[in-house]
Amino acid sequence: MEGLGRSCLWLRRELSPPRPRLLLLDCRSRELYESARIGGALSVALPALLLRRLRRGSLSVRALLPGPPLQPPPPAPVLLYDQGGGRRRRGEAEAEAEEWEAESVLGTLLQKLREEGYLAYYLQGGFSRFQAECPHLCETSLAGRAGSSMAPVPGPVPVVGLGSLCLGSDCSDAESEADRDSMSCGLDSEGATPPPVGLRASFPVQILPNLYLGSARDSANLESLAKLGIRYILNVTPNLPNFFEKNGDFHYKQIPISDHWSQNLSRFFPEAIEFIDEALSQNCGVLVHCLAGVSRSVTVTVAYLMQKLHLSLNDAYDLVKRKKSNISPNFNFMGQLLDFERSLRLEERHSQEQGSGGQASAASNPPSFFTTPTSDGAFELAPT
């Protein structure tokens, strides 16, 4: 990191007009970012799954930044900061004394940005020092903090990482899921090596007893459906037919969502979860499928596991990954699962507070960041 640090004075000058536009990335936790931040900074929202991809080189850091993912690095610098500016090494000058753990978000991003040609630096002393020296250049989402000179900022805070990731500008189902099925092997969970294409199972994959994950081909295979006792079929596409809808032996539900970064799949989570529950309560098999069985159907299945088994996003994703190694939800769907995870935690906290006779905090409903389009708002949770 030697020579890559920039002082608070340098940043103050860069933020003063008419300086070139500076991209500020806040590498702290979402909670700290929402509480207070440097004016104009974007929060880096990287779950462990995407951070692992970034470290392994499976994901380009360019895809995380605003703008088209294939655009060249901008001439303006990128400045990253954390809370304290790194760790001090004894006996060294402050300007050369800051370092980060190899696994940290800031250290990983700084290294990858430099490797990809960005003018990337870190802020010496981090947010704590800058806030102390330049409080007028900081802002907060909390309205009217007594004694604070930081400006409150209404509305959702901007986030970098998942919302800006896009698989294509106007991709069809065949150009997204099907292509990603063949290109995404080995990009997700550590230690998972997908089998050769010719050796992949031809039947749907069992995730839980009676819960199956599959593709369009699986949904059209009457023999395998009968063999597995599947009577309920959740079709997560806008245009694939329900092949046996006229057959009274099957119950269908269709979620008309394309595999595209602009789609809000999370608003269908409650009814999808209810449909799966109905099938399992009847001791019937249920198939959740999309086109290739790697993105939309995986997202719905992971959401179901998170709510019904009280799993974290990482644990639910890894459970599905162990069963089906080639899964690859598009990045905005991953962001919606992150929001869903936060909502589940808030719901559980609210239930605990009610059970203990307390009252839920009035600030317990922060905005969701990835439920696009934004007019759809946040989703309500189905009862567990």
Curated annotation (Swiss-Prot):
Gene behind the chain: DUSP9
Source organism of the structure: Homo sapiens (Human)
Protein name (Swiss-Prot/TrEMBL): Dual specificity protein phosphatase 9
Origin: domain of life: Eukaryota
Record-listed Phosphoserine modification sites: 16, 262, 351
Domain named Tyrosine-protein phosphatase: residues: 203-346
EC number, as in UniProt: 3.1.3.16, 3.1.3.48
Role of this protein: Inactivates MAP kinases. Has a specificity for the ERK family.
Family: Belongs to the protein-tyrosine phosphatase family. Non-receptor class dual specificity subfamily.
Main location, first listed in the record: cytoplasm
Subcellular location as annotated: Cytoplasm
Database matches in SMART domains: DSPc (SM00195), RHOD (SM00450)
PROSITE patterns associated with the record: RHODANESE_3 (PS50206), TYR_PHOSPHATASE_2 (PS50056), TYR_PHOSPHATASE_DUAL (PS50054)
GO CC terms: cytoplasm; cytosol; nucleus
Biased composition (Polar residues): 359-375
SUPFAM superfamilies recorded: (Phosphotyrosine protein) phosphatases II, Rhodanese/Cell cycle control phosphatase
A molecular function (GO) term: phosphoprotein phosphatase activity
Entries under Pfam families matching the protein: DSPc (PF00782), Rhodanese (PF00581)
Domain Rhodanese, residue spans: 18-139
UniProt keyword terms in alphabetical order: Cytoplasm, Hydrolase, Phosphoprotein, Protein phosphatase
InterPro entries membership: Dual-sp_phosphatase_cat-dom, MKP, Prot-tyrosine_phosphatase-like, Rhodanese-like_dom, Rhodanese-like_dom_sf, Tyr_Pase_dom, TYR_PHOSPHATASE_DUAL_dom
Residues of the signal peptide: none
Reaction(s) catalysed by this chain's protein: O-phospho-L-tyrosyl-[protein] + H2O = L-tyrosyl-[protein] + phosphate; O-phospho-L-seryl-[protein] + H2O = L-seryl-[protein] + phosphate; O-phospho-L-threonyl-[protein] + H2O = L-threonyl-[protein] + phosphate
Region annotation Disordered: where it falls in the sequence: 348-384
Database matches in PANTHER family: DUAL SPECIFICITY PROTEIN PHOSPHATASE, DUAL SPECIFICITY PROTEIN PHOSPHATASE 9
Residues annotated as the enzyme's active site: 290 (phosphocysteine intermediate)
Any one GO biological process: protein dephosphorylation
